[in-house]
């Protein structure tokens, strides 16, 4: 689901416009197991995480791309873990201070997962448009 307007507040209490989502896993799992599941699902070579491997998580918030600005929003929404990318040092500190489990899975990895779907959607809607997708990880190989 989308965040509610009551949840879309930054750490100073100001309203923000979060584009992330929040949902619930079918059953709780350990942070360590969930981290491995994210790594496999997004085909991550590596990722960074904050949290105890044996802590149970079930409510997951996510924002593809650089979503570090929404750590507090995920926390207010009741997420056990927040999946995003490009988390900066002070954002990671905030997550740790809040006790928020955090997975930084990489910018490309968190956005690339939708490319095949969007490509098909655009081809269906716009027959005269050429659509290309790239599987190359930009910048850092």
Language-model region placement:
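Hydrophobic structural segments
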Residues: 1-141
């Amino acid at each position: 689901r989308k965040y509610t307007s009551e949840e879309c507040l930054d750490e100073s209490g100001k309203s923000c416009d979060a584009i992330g989502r929040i949902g619930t896993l079918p059953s709780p799992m350990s942070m360590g197991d969930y981290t491995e599941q994210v790594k496999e699902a997004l085909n991550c070579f590596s990722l960074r995480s904050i949290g105890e491997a044996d802590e149970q998580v079930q409510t997951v918030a996510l924002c593809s791309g650089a979503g570090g600005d929404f750590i507090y929003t995920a926390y207010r929404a009741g997420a056990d873990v927040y999946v995003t990318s490009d988390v900066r040092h002070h954002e990671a500190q905030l997550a740790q201070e809040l006790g928020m489990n955090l997975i930084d899975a990489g910018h490309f990895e968190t956005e690339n997962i939708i490319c095949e779907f969007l490509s098909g959607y655009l081809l269906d809607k716009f027959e005269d448009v050429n659509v290309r997708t790239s599987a190359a990880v930009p910048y850092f190989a």
